[in-house]
Each structure stands twice: as structure tokens, then as C-alpha cells.
Amino acid sequence: MAIKPKDMAKMIDHTNLNPTATVDDIKKLCAEAKEHEFASVCINPIYVPLAAKLLEECSVKVCTVVGFPLGANTTEVKSYETRNAIKNGAQEIDMVMNIGAFKSGALEIFKSDIKAVVDATKTAGVTSDIIVKVILETCYLDEEEIKQACEIAKDAGVDFVKTSTGFGSHGARIEDVSLMRKTVGRDVGVKASGGIHNFEEALDMLDAGANRIGASSGVTIVTDEKD
């Protein structure tokens, strides 16, 4: 793919999900996102009101996480988290799938968990569309499981499938991103996240089929000129 680092900014979710992230860290993240015109900032729910205020006059979206990082919250809690995040100003939701239900073969429960979050975005009292990304945590899945999870997530109505939380045993891998893209086709986005540190690594993910990158190294990626 022929793209310059600075042109990649619109595909990057500039991320700080560190449990030790401070108010100043989030202010810095938002300032960087505004400067480089990233797609969004991806932050923990506690900081959504702050980010929404800091970014209200620009195109950068506020993205937060639901059921993070294990995906083991009840569906009711995930639905509440989603509505609460949107009430506080979130415009994109990255939810962690119910990995245990999926691994147990409880596929109806698995699907309904995802669909409940999608439905919660439509009843949160906002007029704009809320983007939902489902985190598969691919480090715990084999190829057939990745494919099946993608198929079910697509059928549940998500906007993106996403590789990783960044808290698992490994992050995005080229082969997983490629499989995810082949499975969901062009109707659903693919977000690669976890372990993407520079422009070349981000470009590899785009070449594999990703159209969104989640990274804490967004500034490095978009300023990584090789000319």
C-alpha cells in the first residue's frame, strides 16, 4: 500500500489503556490526537468525560472499552457500560467478546452478548451512529475459532472486528488480520491492535487488510518518515 506516515493518522486509534494513566496523560493523548488528526483516542471509561470535553471542537472521536480486558462481565453489565459511556461522550465502543462462552460452545450466549452491546448503542439517546468494535483476543484462538468468531460478530451487527486488548499473550499478527479480513469481507472493518510500534509494522497490518490501527505509539507511527 502506497501511503505516507502522516496520511495514516485517520486510521489510528491513539491509545492509552494503561491502568496507571493519569489526567495529565489523557490530556497529552488528546492534544497529540488533535495535532495529528487521529481517528480517535481510545481510553478507559473513567476518562471519557474529560476526553469528550477536550475534543468537542475537533474531528477526533472518543473511543472507550467495555468488558475490558477479560470480556467476562455479564451481558447486563456490558450493556450498562455501553450506555453509560455514550452518555459521558463516547462515540466508539471497543467491547471484549465473551471468550469463555465462545470456548464453551455456547454460541447463542456469545452472539447475544455482542448483539446486546450493539443494541445498547441504539437506545442510548444519541442521534449519531456509534461505532462498535468487538475484540476477539486472537492470542487465545486458533484459525477456525477466529473465522467463526468473525462470522458471528458480523451477523450480530458490529462495525469492526479487532484483534487484541493488548493485555493478552500477544497482539496483532499479520496472518490473523488477513484471515479476519477474508472472513468479514468489505462490509465490516478490521482493527489491528497490540504490539504495533512504528510505521512499517502499521503498514504491514494495512496491507494484510486492516483499516484501523490501535496503538499507543501513534505519534511515532505518523512521524516515522523514511525518505
Each language-model region and where it sits:
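Short hydrophobic "strand-cap" motifs at the C-terminus of beta-strands
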Residues: S193
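Alpha/beta enzyme core
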Residues: A2-H36, V48-F68, A72-V190, N198-D227
